[in-house]
Amino acid sequence: MEVKSAKELKRISKELQENFLNRWKLLNLEQDKDRLKSLTEKAEDPNLWNNPEEARLVSQKKNELEKKLNPWFTIQQDILDFPDLVDLTLDEKGENGVGELSSEYNRLQEKFEELELLGALKNPEDLKPAFLNIHPGAGGTESQDWAEMLLRMYTRYFEKKGYQYSLIDVQAGDGAGIKNATLHVIGDFAFGFLKGENGVHRLVRISPFDANKRRHTSFVSVHVSPEIDDDIDIKIEEKDIRVDVYRSSGAGGQHVNTTDSAVRITHMPSGIVVACQNERSQIKNRDTAFKMLKARLYELEQEKAKEELEKKSGEKKDITWGSQIRSYVFHPYNLVKDHRTDHETGNVAAVMDGDIEPFILAYLKTL
């Protein structure tokens, strides 16, 4: 934004300060700040470590609050002091000071807009690691190939974002692509940033598997769930689950498992099936599979509660888990479009190489 006068600069500097204070109040950040102070004092108490479990919980909650608040602390004083800086500089330099202050205003405004997006990630689970599952729809090789393309798109995004990820389950397709894949993603606000990817992703292209070079439409569903802490009580009855062990079905090579260490858990009441095969240890794979099941059951309970609330309030959901959220058109033109936000780009190659942050941010702005 180009600031044209000292009068305008004074006005927008005060607006920025007011917007920051309003957002701080709206998000109850002062309460969070007090909670962080209390947790920090607890963490510094040597007696806390007499109870390792309590110490772990205090440390975890403290770290989560720090992740949430530190971006606000970083910019808070600069924004609150900016109107005074404007007054002092303009008193000294007059209109000649507008240029240098204009660039500082733009920097602060940009940082504040980033904070507003983080403010949309206000649920506790938004801070958590995430499980991302990719599952092709009907269509055989065509949709399985599309699933593998999406798997690459997401892994490239994680690499650019600085997120750690591991492929904890993958099932090879029939000749090409994949039948199923699950990723474990760790990073700041991992679930918060990825939750908007829930839904059906549609591809339109000339099929490389069709000798007649006809145009095909393929569908893949993406499901994202947060990793749930041990302190959240999700009861899983032994009688409600079936545990199967099997040999890893990954891409192969020198590190392929030659023992039945992969684990699949079926939760019979809900029909939820989870699997993990990335570790050589059956015990570790079982632990990860149970974490995934716990995450899915927690999410199921959250959905039920949300639906019940919507029934009581008379609200109607516009978007369901099975909704088509985004189209990727390779032919007869190049376009990727999100149907919830109308955000779009013609640079399909960049999107498929992991450039999906603009789509994610556009979705977060709607929350």
Curated annotation (Swiss-Prot):
Task: Classify the source by domain of life.
Answer: Bacteria
* Cystine bridges: none
Of the GO CC terms on this record, one is: cytoplasm
Q: Which UniProt keywords apply?
A: Cytoplasm, Methylation, Protein biosynthesis
Post-translational events = Methylated by PrmC. Methylation increases the termination efficiency of RF2.
Q: Name one GO molecular function term.
A: translation release factor activity, codon specific
Keyword Cytoplasm recorded: yes
Residues that the record marks as modified (N5-methylglutamine) are: 254
Q: Which InterPro entries match?
A: PCRF, Pep_chain_release_fac_I, Pep_chain_release_fac_I_sf, PrfB
PROSITE patterns the UniProt entry points to: RF_PROK_I
Q: Where does this polypeptide localize?
A: Cytoplasm
Give the similarity note.
Belongs to the prokaryotic/mitochondrial release factor family.
The job of this chain, per UniProt, is described as:
Peptide chain release factor 2 directs the termination of translation in response to the peptide chain termination codons UGA and UAA.
PANTHER family registered for this protein in UniProt: CLASS I PEPTIDE CHAIN RELEASE FACTOR, PEPTIDE CHAIN RELEASE FACTOR 2
Q: Can you name this protein?
A: Peptide chain release factor 2
Q: Which organism is it from?
A: Leptospira interrogans serogroup Icterohaemorrhagiae serovar copenhageni (strain Fiocruz L1-130)
